[in-house]
Every structure is written in structure tokens, then in C-alpha cells.
UniProtKB/Swiss-Prot annotation:
This is Phosphopantetheine adenylyltransferase. Pathway: Cofactor biosynthesis; coenzyme A biosynthesis; CoA from (R)-pantothenate: step 4/5. It catalyses: (R)-4'-phosphopantetheine + ATP + H(+) = 3'-dephospho-CoA + diphosphate. GO terms for cellular component: cytoplasm. Reversibly transfers an adenylyl group from ATP to 4'-phosphopantetheine, yielding dephospho-CoA (dPCoA) and pyrophosphate. The gene is coaD.
């Protein structure tokens, strides 16, 4: 049986922390779908299409990764893809409480889909898309925080020269 995992998020933008979780998941599962969730309660910086393109470029060297978007419940998407796992990254203990609530709800919706938590590498434990955007907004270097394609996209959006 093929093991299929879903790694979801807003990825606005994808960071090296996200990429670390995706790469590590891709070593464990036969296929990993990286899914941009279109959350109507968030005002995204990058459009869904831009985020999909950035993720495709950032993951192009990982053959068992596929990139997609979804606007509904994650469990419904997982069922549609015959996925048996949801892959989540944890930066700190504070992430766990929120993730536990989401996992409990997902299990209530479909008890056959398991959630796997991966602790982020220490170097990314502080990292979030919000922090990346804030640093980039004021012209700070994000070279150690995001893939090169994302750095270029941020510079373009904020119209700041590359450092």
C-alpha cells in the first residue's frame, strides 16, 4: 500500500522551516502533497497561484512531492487523495496545543487518517512566514530563512534591492 501524506498550510510564503518538514516527510512517505489551504479569514500577502509556484520551485528536486491547493476541510482533501496521514511541523510546545485541537477534530471527521508531528530543527524553531515578511518589509536579509525563489519574490513585492 502506498503511504500518502498531506502537508498543509497557508505557506505565505514557504520558509526553510516548512521545507525542512516537507523534505523529512518525503523520506518517510511514498508521496507528500503540499497543500496551500485557502483560508478566507486570512488576507494573504501572496496569491494562491503565487504560493503554488513558489512551492513548486522550492520542492522541484523532491520527486515524491506534489503541490496543490484546497479551499475546504483538510480531511476531505486527504480522502480525495487517498492519503492516510497528515504531516504537521511543531516549532515549540505552544504549537502543540493548537495542533492537538486540530488533530482531535480531524480524527472526529475521519478516524482512519493519522496525524504525524515532526519537530522542526532548532535553527527554524523561531521561524514563521509572518516574521519573514516583517524582516523583508524593512529590507532585512531573509537569505537564511527562505528558499532563493522566495527571497526574490519578497524583494520584488517590497521593491527592495537584493542584499
Amino acid at each position: 500500500m502506498t503511504s500518502i501524506a498531506i502537508s498543509s498550510g497557508s505557506f505565505d510564503p514557504i520558509t526553510l522551516g516548512h521545507l525542512d518538514i516537507i523534505k523529512r516527510g518525503a523520506k518517510v512517505f511514498d508521496e507528500v502533497y503540499v497543500v496551500v489551504l485557502n483560508n478566507s479569514s486570512k488576507k494573504p500577502f501572496f496569491s494562491v497561484e503565487e504560493r503554488l509556484e513558489l512551492i513548486r520551485e522550492a520542492t522541484k528536486d523532491i520527486p515524491n512531492v506534489k503541490v496543490d491547493s484546497h479551499s475546504g476541510l483538510l480531511v476531505e482533501y486527504a480522502k480525495m487523495r487517498n492519503a492516510n496521514a497528515i504531516l504537521r511541523g511543531l516549532r515549540a510546545v505552544s504549537d502543540f496545543e493548537y495542533e492537538m485541537q486540530i488533530t482531535s477534530m480531524n480524527r472526529k471527521l475521519d478516524e482512519n487518517i493519522e496525524t504525524f508531528f515532526i519537530m522542526t530543527n532548532n535553527q527554524y524553531s523561531f521561524l514563521s512566514s509572518s516574521i519573514v515578511k516583517e524582516v523583508a518589509r524593512y529590507g532585512g536579509s531573509v537569505v537564511d530563512l527562505v528558499p532563493p525563489i522566495v527571497e526574490r519574490a519578497l524583494k520584488e513585492k517590497f521593491q527592495t534591492p537584493l542584499k
